[in-house]
């Protein structure tokens, strides 16, 4: 059984990490769970698993991030790439440049989320460097 996350996977505008325990406590029993505006997936990742769970989001960058995490080899590569990313304005600026490489897109999403001022940094919205 996978371990429950102890921190949000990615800072996301409107993220429910702190509210997730309260939200989960007030959920009725269910077999199907749908996250229509998935974002960082804080509630989905913290709630007990059920028969069917659906994650959806219009933002292709965050959807790509979760696709990369789903693949064990890519997940390990993403973790390593993030560990080796220096906390620098140049990296932050580079994170807004387009790339076709799925792993690099996921890393850049993480960089924008971690280094951007405000949680909107994970999106393509331009934010300040923190």
Model-derived segments and spans:
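Class I S-adenosyl-L-methionine-dependent methyltransferase module
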Residues: 49-130
């Amino acid at each position: 059984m996978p371990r429950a996350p102890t921190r949000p996977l990615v800072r996301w505008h409107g993220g429910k990490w702190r509210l997730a325990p309260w939200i989960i406590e007030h959920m009725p029993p269910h077999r199907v769970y749908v996250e229509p505006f998935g974002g960082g997936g804080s509630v989905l990742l913290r709630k007990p698993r059920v028969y069917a769970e659906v994650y959806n989001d219009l933002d292709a960058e965050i959807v790509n991030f979760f696709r990369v995490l789903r693949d064990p080899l890519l997940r390990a590569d993403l973790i390593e790439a993030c560990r080796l990313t220096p906390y620098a304005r140049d990296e932050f600026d580079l994170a807004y440049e387009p790339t076709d490489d799925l792993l690099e897109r996921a890393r850049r999403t993480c960089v924008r989320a971690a280094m951007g001022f405000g949680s909107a940094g994970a999106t393509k919205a331009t934010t300040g460097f923190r």
